[in-house]
Amino acid sequence: MDYQTDVTEDNVQIRGRARSVEGKKHNGSGLTGVKRHAVSETSQKSQQGTGNGTMTNIAEEQTITVTYNFNF
């Protein structure tokens, strides 16, 4: 949910045109960081034993990251 508030695609595109090289590097590192955090959170949840809940959460988080990849 926080990613939707932080996206502001219009501002990102305007700044991205002026700073295309820097913007791509920062966006790439940010997406990798999001994926790493998602994996760590799902691994901790899987240890708690809520198997079915973790699987649905993993699917939702992966779809969110994929949509942001297409937006960038």
UniProtKB/Swiss-Prot annotation:
Residues 16-58 are annotated as: Disordered. Signal peptide: none annotated. Keywords: Transport, Viral movement protein. One of its GO terms (biological process) is transport of virus in host, cell to cell. Residues 40-58 have a biased composition (Polar residues). The keyword Ion transport does not apply. The keyword Oxidoreductase does not apply. Belongs to the carmovirus/necrovirus/panicovirus movement protein p8 family. Cell-to-cell movement. This is Probable movement protein p8.
